[in-house]
Amino acid sequence: MMDFAIFWDWLSFAVRWLHVVTGIAWIGSSFYFVALDLGLRQRPGMPVGAFGEEWQVHGGGFYHIQKYLVAPAEMPEHLTWFKWESYATWLSGFAMLCVVYYAGADLFLIDPNVLPMSAPVGILLSMATIGVGWVVYDLLCRSPLGKSDTGLMLVLYCVLVFIAWGLTHLFTGRAAFLHLGAITATIMSANVFMVIIPNQKIVVADLIAGRKPDPKYGKIAKQRSLHNNYLTLPVLFLMLSNHYPLAFGTEFNWVIASLVFIIGVLIRHYFNTVHKRAGNPHWTWLGALVLFIIIIWLSTVPKVLTGEPKVSASAQVYIASAHFPAVRDTVLGRCSMCHAAEPVYEGIYHAPKGVMLDTDAGIADHAREIYLQAGRSHAMPPANVSQITDKERALLVAWFEGAGK
């Protein structure tokens, strides 16, 4: 019978793969249409109602694209709506949140040293932060502040900074970054689902019926689309950050997250300006570089823990196991030279993925990962540099599978 932990790990991999694929589709189409829209040109003799056009070449063929702000003379029977890329990305992302962070809440979501809570409370708090994030954003956009694009963006940035700070006081550093990305991605996808597509459908229905559409729908959709454009790169950074503990494992992780949003805006501003043929603002790259150097410096400030590391409730069974003393000796001797608060292995300056196995709490909390990486597979240590034996691997398997029995 297949081990459940192995099945769950493959499920996590499959959902992550799906999320990456759908994300590529969404981001690709989004970037393409932003560049296309900004690059449209007008010329004499264009069809009635055409706002602009663009000639493109790709894959050995030529494409002639025209944009209409109102219905063309003959409304096509079929329209391609670009929406499922967004929906599928959010759904697969939420599925991954459930598979990794909710199913493994005691390890990946909750840090007893930050805020002790039960797994159900942590999960409810997670869902609440994601939902409240969208509600606050939407209310701000619909408020009088929404009439000023610049003013709205500045206020939204301050809100994101506050959320980043708050999340680091609720969850693990890794989960805080992931949730900031999830809140931002939810805002982006909800913009498509609840604003952009519905508004576009209203406009299309009016055009088909021969009515003059209200320009406010297009203006609102364009504002939300602009927000999505500028939020894309920070979301990608936040989603990738769980592989780089230097980003989330520092005392100033919330400051790093806040600076990443500015970097993303600077980079997108450069490409938007170039695609619009309105100049070549190289200064944006200099600004992004300076901010990234500041991020590197901030990442060197470790997160200070007060008191002894606390063991999560679900990990107590692994410490109580009769195998634990031998397992501890094995892990300390074979793994902790890298996976420690202060690694001693040459070339390793920070614990890979932030996983520290130099305490009883760290070993017990990461029992499942030790079992999969060093017990059931030979993925760890890399190239077996610490020469862990088959007998020791069998011990790790027996410890995990026998815990609580």
Where are these regions (language model features)?
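Short, strongly hydrophobic alpha-helical membrane anchors
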Residues: 1-12
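Hydrophobic alpha-helical membrane-embedded segments
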Residues: 16-46, 183-199
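Membrane-interface amphipathic/juxtamembrane segments adjacent to transmembrane helices
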Residues: 30-73
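Loop-to-transmembrane boundary segments
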Residues: 69-94, 200, 215-234
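Aromatic- and Gly/Pro-enriched helix-to-coil junctions and flexible linker segments
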Residues: 74, 81, 101, 281-284, ...
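Alpha-helical transmembrane segments and their membrane-interface junctions
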Residues: 81, 86-105, 164-178, 231-250
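Long, contiguous internal "core" modules enriched in hydrophobic/ aromatic residues
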Residues: 103-217
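Membrane-interfacial entry segments at the cytosolic side of transmembrane helices
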Residues: 146-154, 249-253, 275-289
